[in-house]
UniProtKB/Swiss-Prot annotation:
It comes from Trichormus variabilis (strain ATCC 29413 / PCC 7937). The gene is prfC. Belongs to the TRAFAC class translation factor GTPase superfamily. Classic translation factor GTPase family. PrfC subfamily. This is Peptide chain release factor 3. The keyword Lyase does not apply. Pfam families: EF-G_D2, GTP_EFTU, RF3_C. It comes from the Bacteria. Transmembrane segments: none annotated. One of its GO terms (biological process) is regulation of translational termination.
Amino acid sequence: MSTEIQTELHQAVELRRNFAIISHPDAGKTTLTEKLLLYGGAIHEAGAVKARRAQRKATSDWMAMEQQRGISITSTVLQFEYQNCQINLLDTPGHQDFSEDTYRTLAAADNAVMLIDVAKGLEPQTRKLFEVCKLRGLPIFTFINKLDRPGREPLELLDEIEQELGLQTYAVNWPIGMGDRFKGVFDRNKQQIHLFERSAHGSKEARDTTVELGDPRIEELLEEDLYYQLKNDLELLEGVGPELDLDLVHQGKMTPVFFGSAMTNFGVELFLKYFLNYALKPGVHISSVGEVAPTYPEFSGFVFKLQANMDPKHRDRVAFIRVCTGKFEKDMTVNHARTGKIVRLSRPQKLFAQERESIDVAYPGDVIGLNNPGVFAIGDTIYTGQKLEYEGIPYFSPELFATLRNPNPSKFKQFQKGISELREEGAVQIMYSVDEAKRDPIMAAVGQLQFEVVQFRLQNEYGVETILELLPYSVARWVDGGWEALNKVGRIFNTTTVKDSMNRPVLLFRNEWNCQQLQGDHPELKLSAIAPVFSSQTVE
């Protein structure tokens, strides 16, 4: 490898940060996302997040159904610069029904920001997504939000994170007041108080007055009881809390905690500055040839998301690719690991929600969009040089099932195309009965809203009305060993056998008890709640 390329890759990796935000619905994720973009200069004025408000639509909520409802349904990639760093923000759905899409996005992230509502603390979706981050070993940075509203005691929230998630906590800053008396935060590292002035609806950057802890001006700027409370809290923190250990942070064992209000912009820029210093840079990835460093000179990356019809004016399909190693260049040819084909990567795009601009180069940690004429599937690896493949992205066990019928025969082709594209995109899992007479697809999802999204998009983007009929199942299990293992068992009861999109057997059960009963009757049959992962997944 030439010294020039080595230096170029090293510098690019040093200046890149990549993260996803995980949260429960309504914790303020879309608002925080927009405020980070505001401070990064990517947008000049933050739009309101609720679709019904008269202001602009939120930048990251672009799909028609999202704009109608004011919630995030799909994952979006937002790229911006701050203090010379290239930041890739993988904006994940906040709605509880979309944990599977969120999981796929977390596969492309190097860090996670856990967003918590100060009034509610840890909520079910946050816990679930934390487990996914833990599984992947991601460093977790905590932002406790909505300090401009009444909430729980900060020390109580730190204790909850430690007790329930098993994470050590280190408060990087500390709130001064709460609710309508929320004045700012204290930076523990620099021993400085940041007092904020509210901007109109938080649409502009917050003005910040910074004073040292012992500065006599504090008595003029801060009410006496708030200053007294701050000093008491800091004494408690210094007495019982651990020191910040970045090695533990990078191992996912300690979380730096920040307090603020995304709505009013209080504490957002301070969080962003510290995050850039503390977060992991793009690192090694496990592949079929072992660990591969980002500075490896050959290009490689993997597909973590497919999205059809990002622009309704152009019925296009885009593959989201996480660059893992080397340098991506426009019009380069790469090997497609699953098919063995050589693919020319033309018209690469930098993604910013629905807006896209052409790019010429990209580096490890970046996410690029490639037009996808049916070439790519989720989990695919592309590379130059020596063959390598990254581990695929698994499917998780769905909990809701329904048949989907097209009552209009003249719309058969549109229906088939829509179902195929939405399945490839990961909007929903599609299964089929083993009975050839039953041709209607079976949708499998982790939440009811996924069904609504599929029906809405079939109508809105493909012009197909559909009829949905719920099925009485709540548990799905893949059969280890495939059809051969299943056929050896012979006849089984209290289950329905279907096949997934890769023609693998899946057993559907009405409840967990039926599933356990089958495993008790046939211990030789090994079942899995996660679909088997093959680096090269061939659709039959």
